[in-house]
A protein has these predicted regions:
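Feature captures the catalytic cores and cofactor-binding loops of soluble hydro-lyases/lyases
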Residues: 22-23, 29-46, 50-120
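An N-cap/entry alpha-helix motif that binds or orients negatively charged groups
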Residues: 1, 5-29, 39
Length: 120
């Protein structure tokens, strides 16, 4: 799925200067606990979160996430945006809740990530 599809499905917008609507995301994962995110293979994935801190960007960097989508109309602080732009990780935001965001993305064809050990 391309970020352009994510933007349409979730009525999201870019909140960072980094990012192209043509960027492909291979799967999706949602969490506010970043330790949970590190248990899954998020390489090339869309990370959906309500955590608007630099920690989400650091986790995205470690997990090789393709893009971050904030829910509930959250906008990350300047230091998180600066870090994301420095690392080339697009930041998006939607007014939708995490539940509705994930439902729309799944219904639109975005598949979930698998755990790093291969179990679903």
């Amino acid at each position: 799925m391309r970020l352009s599809d994510v933007l349409i499905l979730t009525r999201a917008r870019f909140v960072s200067a980094t990012g192209s609507p043509n960027l492909e995301v291979r799967a999706g994962f949602a969490a506010d606990l970043m330790s949970d995110a590190l248990r899954y293979d998020l390489s090339g994935a869309l990370l959906v979160s309500g955590l608007a801190t630099p920690q989400v960007v650091r986790t995205a960097e470690m997990a090789d996430v393709a893009a971050i989508l904030m829910v509930r109309d959250k906008v990350p602080p300047p230091e998180a945006l600066d870090l994301a732009e420095e690392l080339g990780i697009p930041f998006l935001s939607t007014q939708l809740t995490m539940f509705e965001t994930c439902g729309r993305l799944f219904a639109g064809g975005l598949l979930p990530c698998e755990r790093c050990n291969g179990h679903k």
